[in-house]
Amino acid sequence: MLDHPSDGLAAIRTHISAIFGSLELSRSAWLVTSLSPGKGEKMSRHSVTAGDVAGLMKLFADLGRKAKARTGESYPIITIQEAGLDGFWLHRVLQQEGVESHVVDPASIAMPRRSRRAKTDRLDGETLLRALLAYKRGEPRVCAMVVAPSPEEEDRRRICRERG
Protein backbone atom coordinates (compact mmCIF):
# COMPACT_ATOMS: atom_id res chain seq x y z
CA MET A 1 0.00 0.00 0.00
CA LEU A 2 1.25 3.49 -0.87
CA ASP A 3 1.61 6.16 1.76
CA HIS A 4 0.75 8.81 -0.84
CA PRO A 5 -1.80 7.57 -3.37
CA SER A 6 -1.23 8.83 -6.90
CA ASP A 7 -3.93 10.77 -8.71
CA GLY A 8 -2.35 9.98 -12.07
CA LEU A 9 0.91 10.09 -13.92
CA ALA A 10 3.50 12.47 -12.54
CA ALA A 11 5.24 14.84 -14.91
CA ILE A 12 8.91 14.18 -15.39
CA ARG A 13 10.80 17.32 -14.47
CA THR A 14 14.19 18.10 -15.86
CA HIS A 15 16.48 20.45 -13.98
CA ILE A 16 17.84 22.86 -16.54
CA SER A 17 21.24 24.13 -15.45
CA ALA A 18 22.20 25.89 -18.70
CA ILE A 19 20.77 27.73 -21.66
CA PHE A 20 20.52 25.16 -24.44
CA GLY A 21 20.34 26.11 -28.10
CA SER A 22 20.19 24.32 -31.42
CA LEU A 23 21.42 26.02 -34.58
CA GLU A 24 19.86 25.32 -37.98
CA LEU A 25 22.18 26.97 -40.49
CA SER A 26 21.12 28.08 -43.97
CA ARG A 27 22.54 30.53 -46.48
CA SER A 28 20.19 33.35 -45.49
CA ALA A 29 19.33 32.78 -41.82
CA TRP A 30 20.30 30.84 -38.72
CA LEU A 31 17.32 29.47 -36.80
CA VAL A 32 18.05 29.21 -33.07
CA THR A 33 15.77 27.05 -30.94
CA SER A 34 16.46 27.61 -27.24
CA LEU A 35 15.44 26.30 -23.85
CA SER A 36 16.27 28.47 -20.85
CA PRO A 37 15.98 28.02 -17.07
CA GLY A 38 12.88 29.50 -15.50
CA LYS A 39 10.67 29.08 -18.58
CA GLY A 40 9.28 25.66 -17.80
CA GLU A 41 9.73 23.41 -20.79
CA LYS A 42 8.79 25.98 -23.42
CA MET A 43 11.18 26.25 -26.35
CA SER A 44 11.75 29.63 -28.01
CA ARG A 45 12.67 30.28 -31.63
CA HIS A 46 14.83 33.12 -32.88
CA SER A 47 16.32 34.03 -36.24
CA VAL A 48 19.72 35.59 -36.89
CA THR A 49 21.05 36.66 -40.28
CA ALA A 50 23.42 33.97 -41.60
CA GLY A 51 27.03 34.79 -40.77
CA ASP A 52 26.12 37.36 -38.10
CA VAL A 53 28.21 35.99 -35.23
CA ALA A 54 27.85 39.27 -33.30
CA GLY A 55 24.05 38.99 -33.62
CA LEU A 56 24.17 35.38 -32.42
CA MET A 57 26.29 36.32 -29.41
CA LYS A 58 23.91 39.22 -28.64
CA LEU A 59 21.01 36.75 -28.73
CA PHE A 60 22.84 34.46 -26.29
CA ALA A 61 23.58 37.44 -24.01
CA ASP A 62 19.89 38.46 -24.10
CA LEU A 63 18.82 34.90 -23.25
CA GLY A 64 21.31 34.91 -20.37
CA ARG A 65 20.02 38.24 -19.01
CA LYS A 66 16.41 37.05 -19.16
CA ALA A 67 17.24 33.75 -17.42
CA LYS A 68 19.13 35.65 -14.70
CA ALA A 69 16.15 38.01 -14.23
CA ARG A 70 13.85 34.98 -13.80
CA THR A 71 16.06 32.91 -11.51
CA GLY A 72 18.75 35.18 -10.06
CA GLU A 73 21.49 32.92 -11.45
CA SER A 74 23.87 33.01 -14.41
CA TYR A 75 23.99 30.04 -16.79
CA PRO A 76 26.42 28.72 -19.40
CA ILE A 77 25.37 28.46 -23.04
CA ILE A 78 25.43 24.98 -24.62
CA THR A 79 24.74 24.60 -28.35
CA ILE A 80 24.37 21.91 -30.97
CA GLN A 81 24.51 22.05 -34.75
CA GLU A 82 24.63 19.43 -37.48
CA ALA A 83 27.87 18.70 -39.29
CA GLY A 84 27.47 20.00 -42.81
CA LEU A 85 28.83 21.99 -45.70
CA ASP A 86 29.43 25.04 -43.48
CA GLY A 87 32.34 23.25 -41.89
CA PHE A 88 33.43 23.83 -38.32
CA TRP A 89 34.24 27.54 -38.33
CA LEU A 90 31.17 28.52 -36.30
CA HIS A 91 31.87 25.74 -33.78
CA ARG A 92 35.38 27.15 -33.28
CA VAL A 93 34.12 30.73 -32.94
CA LEU A 94 31.52 29.67 -30.36
CA GLN A 95 34.18 27.85 -28.33
CA GLN A 96 36.43 30.92 -28.44
CA GLU A 97 33.49 32.96 -27.09
CA GLY A 98 33.09 30.58 -24.12
CA VAL A 99 30.12 28.63 -25.50
CA GLU A 100 30.07 24.85 -25.03
CA SER A 101 29.52 23.87 -28.67
CA HIS A 102 28.70 20.40 -30.03
CA VAL A 103 28.56 19.22 -33.63
CA VAL A 104 26.43 16.15 -34.31
CA ASP A 105 26.40 13.64 -37.16
CA PRO A 106 22.87 14.24 -38.53
CA ALA A 107 22.47 10.58 -39.54
CA SER A 108 23.03 9.48 -35.93
CA ILE A 109 19.97 11.18 -34.42
CA ALA A 110 17.33 8.60 -33.58
CA MET A 111 14.10 9.01 -35.58
CA PRO A 112 10.89 6.99 -35.67
CA ARG A 113 11.32 4.42 -38.43
CA ARG A 114 7.71 3.50 -39.16
CA SER A 115 6.08 6.86 -39.66
CA ARG A 116 6.80 9.59 -42.16
CA ARG A 117 7.83 12.81 -40.56
CA ALA A 118 7.48 16.40 -41.65
CA LYS A 119 10.79 18.08 -42.44
CA THR A 120 10.88 21.70 -41.31
CA ASP A 121 13.56 23.84 -39.70
CA ARG A 122 11.27 24.28 -36.68
CA LEU A 123 10.97 20.51 -36.15
CA ASP A 124 14.66 19.98 -36.88
CA GLY A 125 15.57 22.62 -34.29
CA GLU A 126 13.39 20.93 -31.66
CA THR A 127 14.80 17.49 -32.53
CA LEU A 128 18.38 18.77 -32.25
CA LEU A 129 17.62 20.44 -28.94
CA ARG A 130 16.02 17.28 -27.53
CA ALA A 131 19.04 15.25 -28.69
CA LEU A 132 21.39 17.70 -26.95
CA LEU A 133 19.40 17.53 -23.71
CA ALA A 134 19.43 13.71 -23.79
CA TYR A 135 23.16 13.68 -24.61
CA LYS A 136 23.93 16.00 -21.68
CA ARG A 137 21.85 13.78 -19.36
CA GLY A 138 24.11 10.91 -20.38
CA GLU A 139 21.52 8.85 -22.24
CA PRO A 140 23.22 6.16 -24.35
CA ARG A 141 22.98 5.97 -28.15
CA VAL A 142 21.13 9.28 -28.50
CA CYS A 143 23.43 10.68 -31.17
CA ALA A 144 27.06 10.74 -32.24
CA MET A 145 29.01 13.94 -31.73
CA VAL A 146 31.67 14.73 -34.31
CA VAL A 147 35.22 15.63 -33.34
CA ALA A 148 36.04 18.87 -35.11
CA PRO A 149 39.15 18.65 -37.28
CA SER A 150 41.88 21.26 -37.03
CA PRO A 151 41.50 24.15 -39.50
CA GLU A 152 44.42 22.71 -41.50
CA GLU A 153 42.81 19.25 -41.66
CA GLU A 154 39.50 20.81 -42.65
CA ASP A 155 41.24 22.70 -45.48
CA ARG A 156 42.84 19.45 -46.73
CA ARG A 157 39.44 17.71 -46.71
CA ARG A 158 37.85 20.61 -48.59
CA ILE A 159 40.50 20.47 -51.32
CA CYS A 160 39.93 16.72 -51.77
CA ARG A 161 36.14 17.20 -51.99
CA GLU A 162 36.42 20.05 -54.49
CA ARG A 163 38.69 18.00 -56.78
CA GLY A 164 36.45 14.92 -56.59
Predicted region positions:
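Charged, flexible boundary elements
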Residues: M1-R13
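Short, glycine/acidic-enriched loop or turn micro-motifs at the edges of active sites
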Residues: R27, L85, S108
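Short, basic/hydrophobic alpha-helical segments
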Residues: V53-I78
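Long, charge-rich intrinsically disordered scaffolds of nucleic-acid metabolism proteins
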Residues: F88, H102-G164
